[in-house]
């Protein structure tokens, strides 16, 4: 798994672009809460206007508040329209938020001064300013610091103004009572500040987590698209499209089954990806004189020459609708008519043969190096596909393929040699002459194949004057080595590097990107106006694309309409996931730092307790109820913070498990939340019936102790605002649990609201005189007088007994106020909880998508790794991975590499094409089993140093010693040459595998093996179909050791025999044999019966 810093932006290492994206995201995410606040305030103002209009007969007394409220309503509606216009949000959102706060403060000030027309009370507008304080943190798009400043300013302004005003206008309350009342106001507002700040902190952390996972998900999604495109390009660079998809699915299935090293087929046979095609033409081409040229080349020059030559051939093949099949040393063969049949397949191949002959002719004339092209073509049927499990190479098999190979061997340098079957498909498009191929190849004579040489139409035209085709005549040029002259000339052709196409910009798809809110975004335009240094880097281009996609995702995450927008992930009318099982998974997600939510709720309890202690009568029921809740919350907190006590107790693991269960166990967390929130909502109101019920005693009875009476703020009705504020604090405590289920939160708040409204509206304080027919004003006067008479004289202000209160506006306004603010806070918290629940679900959704896409990305990485390692050795594949891939040719020289060729000669006799074996397909199925079993041996740790190079028909080529470059001269002889012994052991394991296949298939195949060691050159050639290969005299001699060997034996050269004998192997001298191109060589057979017991150097 790649490191986090490699693929993702770290939270603490954000660049300017990332910081700007986060700022844009933060403002966008706060867009919806501001709209919600403006909508709530506008609705509340409208309701307040209506209630004042219908509850007061004389509206002239409230002209100021009515005018101000109407003006504020107009402003809030205007602000809503401005905020809704999203183009204004980014620049003016903070200004609009501050303007909204200022309007709320103005409205609160007007309401305060309006109350001075009656009797002033310290509890006036406390719920309103508590609402302002809470929404400053929860709904206004302000920074944490700005929100704290605004909240504290709102608190201090209310306390200072009402403290001064109440002291000046209040005549019925002592200084002690006024001080206690103002102190209770401070506790309420400070509790709102702290709870709001905690709520904002939690919400910002959750919002940042959502942003981080959104960025990660988009980055991984972009990388996934790149990986998929690279995977397709890589697979198509090795295999044709009609075969690659099936093999790709097989690789993914293999990874799911537990990795490539533990893969076992589902049946007795390995998958066979071979198809039969008819009416195709096969072209074989060999560079005559290349062996002599290659011996003079340095490793880099050899790789450059092969890449430039075969790159040019690939271009010619593409222009002539031919598909290159494979490169075998300096041999190049291709087919026309694959995978789609072409009526012009013969003409295509002939045209290509003439073009490559002309290309080599230009090289010869420009450099003076004696090389030419020999081309053979035959038309017929082929079986094409891939066999084996490792180092896939697209190949073709059939008798017609073998005949085409023979046509090349029997051809004439510089000419195109074709069979009569190909001539019949040319439709006289080219003139030909008799080829006499049967005179140069006995197989053609035996099969009575008539051959022809194609006459190049260009040879009949006068040669154009072209100075660059003339043979070099300068002395300096002639003194250059032939390889240097050829290399310099071929470099001017500018062939593409292997795998260069994998990092092209066009490989990144910019198709439509699904966003989680259900809206499908348009294709993201690729930025081309960036600075060259940024756009030149694949990493920079990837970051640009991620920024573009992130901007689209931010628009999709806009919370303007989360409740009503159509989504592919959520139900239309409820925050429930559509995906089956994901709803339960979401509810089981652990909640980190959940214990701090309980700590904040406990602080709200402390605020409610202080308010009751300051302004409520001190009765036994108050102590009992708050004592029980305090014990309960203490138990909950000890449960949540059990790890903090682990140092003091030996059972540390038990305490840690208890504490962690709060975050990881939903049922435990649910029980604790219900107990905590339920106890707070209950304790806020449970004492009200006892406090406000005057009981059977008469008004003149004084059964209240002086201490209790001293702590009363006034009449029972005047206690209602503080019970209301306590209930509101209980509501707010419910909001600190951000991840609480919306249904549970709504249920608790709804039950509490109904109970509160019933208790407040049915309170006895509204019906003190029972069925009395007195006016409300008289009831109010009697209530106030009776209550005043029941208090000790030292607690009343001078003249209080003689002062009669004003008419009974208080009762009516208190009732409206209680109902209004309870419903306002309820609606605010329900809508806010709905929005928070949406974002919590969105956060969980992005995390799930990130996890899923990250797993898919890792799968793609593994698939790409397997694909690349199926083309190249692992250490070579690393050269082509990353941003610097394909910047240079890959080549490497080795001093001591052991090369093995192992063939099954009897397979050529076994292979037949008839209806019984599906025209040879079943024969290839057996060959596929043989090669696949050979490949499975490579997975054993013992043979980890053996590298399969390729298969040539029924010949298996492998090498050992390629995993590390040259430079092991200081090692002892046994360890330096241990890989030679490993390859011999591998050869014997191949023989053993073949014997097992013979037993199951009732055949008698025998392996013929040739081994040689020495210096080689390794490299990757071919841009369209990159191929790893090795070259050198060592490879040629190893091939001759196989072709001149005997069945069931391993033939080695004299030098290799000496090394093997030093490693403890026994060898038998065969004697001198004639080897093509090498003359007579003394060779040896490795004794396979005793070698496995005498391999001393393999441990």
Curated annotation (Swiss-Prot):
Phenotypic consequence of gene deletion: Knockout Adcy7 homozygous mice die during embryogenesis (more than 93%). To obtain adult animals with Adcy7-deficient immune systems, the hematopoietic stem cells obtained from the rare adult Adcy7 homozygous mice are transplanted into lethally irradiated wild-type animals. All chimeric mice survived the transplant procedure and appeared healthy. Adcy7-deficient mice appear to be hypersensitive to lipopolysaccharide-induced endotoxic shock and display a higher mortality rate.
Cited Pfam families: AC_N, Adcy_cons_dom, Guanylate_cyc
Superkingdom of this protein's organism: Eukaryota
Annotated residues for binding of ATP: 286-291, 328-330, 374, 950, 1029-1031, 1036-1040, 1076
Post-translational modification: Phosphorylated by PRKCD.
Membrane topology: Multi-pass membrane protein
Annotated Polar residues bias: 508-518
Region Modulates adenylate cyclase activity by modulating the binding of G(s)alpha to the high-affinity G(s)alpha binding site in 7C1a/7C2, residue ranges: 508-585
Region feature Mediates regulation of adenylate cyclase activity by C5 alpha-induced G- beta and gamma pathway, mapped onto this chain: 479-484
MF-aspect GO terms: adenylate cyclase activity; ATP binding; metal ion binding
Residues covered by region (Mediates regulation of adenylate cyclase activity by sphingosine 1-phosphate-induced G alpha 13 pathway): 493-501
Tissues and organs where the protein is expressed, per its UniProt entry: Most abundant in heart, spleen and lung.
Binding site for Mg(2+) 1: 286, 330
PROSITE patterns assigned: GUANYLATE_CYCLASE_1, GUANYLATE_CYCLASE_2
Binding site for Mg(2+) 2: 286-287, 330
Catalytic activity: ATP = 3',5'-cyclic AMP + diphosphate
Keywords, ordered alphabetically: ATP-binding, cAMP biosynthesis, Glycoprotein, Lyase, Magnesium, Manganese, Membrane, Metal-binding, Nucleotide-binding, Repeat, Transmembrane, Transmembrane helix
Glycosylation sites: 702
Domain notes: The protein contains two modules with six transmembrane helices each; both are required for catalytic activity. Isolated N-terminal or C-terminal guanylate cyclase domains have no catalytic activity, but when they are brought together, enzyme activity is restored. The active site is at the interface of the two domains. Both contribute substrate-binding residues, but the catalytic metal ions are bound exclusively via the N-terminal guanylate cyclase domain.
Protein known as: Adenylate cyclase type 7
Organism (species): Mus musculus
């Amino acid at each position: 798994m790649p490191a986090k810093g490699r693929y993702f932006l770290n939270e603490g290492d954000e660049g300017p672009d990332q910081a700007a994206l986060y700022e844009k995201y933060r403002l966008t995410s706060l867009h919806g809460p501001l709209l919600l606040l403006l909508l709530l305030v506008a609705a509340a103002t409208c309701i307040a206007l209506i209630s004042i209009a219908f509850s007061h007969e004389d509206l002239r007394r409230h002209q100021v508040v009515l005018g101000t409220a109407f003006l504020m309503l107009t402003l809030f509606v205007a602000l809503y329209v401005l905020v809704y216009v999203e183009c204004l949000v980014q620049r003016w959102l903070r200004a609009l938020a501050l303007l909204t706060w200022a309007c709320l403060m103005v409205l609160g000030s007007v309401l305060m001064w309006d109350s001075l027309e009656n009797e002033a009370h310290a509890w006036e507008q406390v719920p309103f300013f508590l609402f302002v304080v809470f929404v400053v943190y929860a709904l206004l798009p302000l920074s944490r610091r700005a929100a704290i400043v605004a909240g504290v300013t709102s608190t201090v302004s209310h306390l200072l103004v009402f403290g001064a005003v109440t002291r000046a206008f209040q005549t019925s309350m002592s200084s002690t009572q006024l001080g206690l009342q103002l102190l209770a106001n401070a506790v309420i507002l400070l509790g709102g500040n702290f709870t709001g700040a905690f709520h904002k902190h939690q919400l910002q952390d959750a919002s940042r987590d959502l942003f981080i996972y959104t960025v990660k998900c988009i980055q991984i999604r972009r990388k996934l698209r790149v990986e998929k495109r690279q995977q397709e390009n890589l697979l198509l660079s090795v295999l044709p499209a009609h075969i690659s998809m099936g093999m790709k699915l097989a690789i993914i299935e293999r990874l799911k089954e537990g990795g490539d090293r533990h893969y076992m087929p589902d049946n007795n046979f390995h998958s066979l990806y071979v198809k039969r095609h008819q009416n195709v033409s096969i072209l074989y081409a060999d560079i005559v004189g290349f062996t002599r040229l290659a011996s003079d080349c340095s490793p880099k020059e050899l790789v450059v020459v092969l890449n430039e030559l075969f790159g040019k051939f690939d271009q010619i093949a593409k222009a002539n609708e031919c598909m290159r099949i494979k490169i075998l040393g300096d041999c190049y063969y291709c087919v026309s008519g694959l995978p789609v049949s072409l009526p012009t397949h013969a003409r295509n191949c002939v045209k290509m043969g003439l073009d490559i002959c002309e290309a080599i002719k230009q090289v010869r004339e420009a450099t003076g190096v004696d090389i030419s092209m020999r081309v053979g073509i035959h038309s017929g049927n082929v079986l094409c596909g891939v066999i084996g499990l490792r180092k896939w190479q697209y190949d073709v098999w059939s008798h017609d393929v073998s005949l085409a190979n023979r046509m090349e061997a029997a051809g004439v340098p510089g000419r195109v040699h074709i069979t009569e079957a190909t001539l019949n498909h040319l439709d006289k498009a080219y003139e030909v002459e008799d080829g006499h191929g049967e005179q140069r190849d006995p197989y053609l004579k035996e099969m009575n194949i008539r051959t022809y040489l194609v006459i190049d139409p260009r040879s009949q035209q006068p040669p154009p004057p072209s100075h660059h085709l003339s043979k070099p005549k300068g002395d300096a040029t002639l003194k250059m080595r032939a390889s240097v002259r050829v290399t310099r000339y071929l470099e001017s052709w500018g062939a593409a590097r292997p795998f260069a196409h994998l990092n092209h910009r066009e490989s990144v798809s910019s198709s439509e990107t699904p966003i989680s809110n259900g809206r499908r975004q348009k294709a993201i335009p690729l930025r081309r106006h960036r600075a060259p240094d940024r756009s030149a880097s694949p990493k920079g281009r990837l970051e640009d694309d991620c920024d573009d996609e992130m901007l689209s995702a931010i628009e999709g995450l806009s919370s303007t309409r989360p409740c009503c927008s159509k989504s592919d992930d959520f139900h239309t009318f409820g925050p429930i996931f559509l995906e089956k099982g994901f709803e339960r998974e979401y509810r089981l997600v652990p909640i980190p730092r959940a214990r701090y939510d309980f700590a904040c709720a406990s602080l709200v309890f402390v605020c409610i307790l202080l308010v009751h202690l300051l302004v409520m009568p001190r009765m036994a029921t108050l102590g009992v109820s708050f004592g029980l809740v305090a014990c309960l919350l203490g138990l909950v907190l000890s449960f949540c913070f059990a790890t903090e006590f682990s140092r003091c107790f030996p059972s540390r693991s038990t305490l840690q498990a208890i504490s962690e269960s709060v975050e990881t166990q939903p049922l435990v967390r649910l029980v604790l939340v219900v107990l905590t929130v339920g106890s707070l909502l209950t304790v806020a109101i449970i004492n009200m019936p006892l406090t406000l019920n005057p009981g059977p005693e008469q008004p003149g009875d004084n059964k209240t102790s002086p201490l209790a009476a001293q702590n009363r703020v006034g009449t029972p009705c005047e206690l209602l605002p503080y019970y209301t504020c306590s209930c509101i604090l209980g509501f707010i405590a419910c909001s600190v649990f951000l991840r609480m289920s919306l249904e549970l939160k709504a249920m608790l708040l709804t039950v509490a609201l109904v109970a509160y409204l019933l208790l407040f509206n049915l309170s006895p304080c509204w019906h003190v005189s029972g069925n009395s027919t007195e006016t409300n004003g008289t009831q109010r006067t009697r209530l106030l007088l009776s209550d005043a008479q029941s208090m000790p004289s030292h607690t009343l202000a001078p003249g209080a007994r003689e002062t009669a209160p004003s008419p009974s506006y208080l009762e009516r306004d208190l009732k409206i106020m209680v109902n209004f603010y309870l419903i306002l806070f309820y609606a605010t918290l329900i809508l806010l909880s709905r929005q928070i629940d949406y974002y919590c679900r969105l956060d969980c959704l992005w995390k799930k998508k990130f996890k899923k896409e990250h797993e898919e990305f890792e799968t793609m990485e593994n698939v790409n790794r397997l694909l690349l390692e199926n083309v190249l050795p692992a250490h070579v594949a690393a050269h082509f991975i990353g941003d610097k891939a394909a910047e240079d040719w890959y080549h490497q020289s080795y001093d001591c590499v052991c090369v093995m060729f192992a063939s099954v000669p009897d397979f050529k006799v076994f292979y037949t094409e008839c209806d019984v074996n599906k025209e040879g397909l079943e024969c290839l199925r057996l060959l596929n089993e043989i090669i696949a079993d050979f490949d499975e041996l490579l997975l054993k740790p013992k043979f980890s140093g053996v590298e399969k190079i390729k298969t040539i028909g029924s010949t298996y080529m492998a090498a050992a010693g390629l995993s590390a470059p040259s430079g092991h001269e200081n090692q002892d002889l046994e360890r330096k040459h241990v890989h030679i012994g490993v390859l011999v052991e591998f050869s014997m394991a191949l023989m053993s595998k073949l014997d097992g296949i013979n037993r199951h298939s009732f055949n008698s195949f025998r392996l013929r093996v040739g081994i040689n060691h020495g210096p080689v050159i390794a490299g990757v050639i071919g841009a369209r179909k990159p191929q790893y290969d090795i070259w050198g005299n060592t490879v040629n001699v190893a091939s001759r050791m196989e072709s001149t060997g005997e069945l069931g034996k391993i033939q080695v050269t004299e030098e290799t025999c000496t090394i093997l004998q030093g490693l403890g192997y026994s060898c038998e001298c065969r004697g001198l044999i004639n080897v093509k191109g090498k003359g007579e060589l003394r060779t040896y057979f490795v004794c396979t019966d005793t070698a496995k017991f005498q391999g001393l150097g393999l441990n």
